[in-house]
Amino acid sequence: MTRSNIEIIRNIYGAFETGDMAAFSAALAPDIVWNEAENYPYADRNPYVGAQAIMEGVFARTAQDFDGFAVSMTDLIDGGDRVVALGRYTGTSRTTGAPLDVQAAHVWTLADGKVVQFQQHIDTLGTARTMRLAG
């Protein structure tokens, strides 16, 4: 029996939460195309292609910039080959000490049980203010 796309995405968030990056990466297609939201601090290398590029360009930088970074997606919406996740990012900026608490939405595209594309939508101004990248 195959898992539903919602289950796959729910498991991805669970793997991220527990730090199981091997399980996270296993859910991604080898040539996944990952895009951070325009004007987000880590969008400078868009698109990220492949799990290693995502780990180094997004997750390692996030861990470097934030203490206690967490992604809490409260709603998962089934759109067939797409799953939309709605929730929040939280953490504390290591540079400023300011708390991060911003809305986020993710659009995941799946094919054959693997994530082939990811698009982040987020409060980029709130993030920039937390990091003191904007006034």
Question: For the regions a protein language model found, what residue spans apply to each?
Answer:
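Short, low-complexity N-terminal intrinsically disordered segments enriched in polar/charged residues
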Residues: 1-30, 131-135
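A beta-strand edge to alpha-helix "cap/lid" segment located at domain peripheries
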Residues: 1-4, 59-135
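Hydrophobic pocket/interface hotspot
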Residues: 9-12, 23-28, 32, 50, ...
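Short, mixed-charge, low-aromatic patches
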Residues: 10-19, 42-45, 62-66, 86-88
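Gly/Ser/Thr-rich helix-start
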Residues: 20, 51, 98
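A solvent-exposed, acidic/Ser-Thr-rich amphipathic alpha-helical stretch
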Residues: 30-80
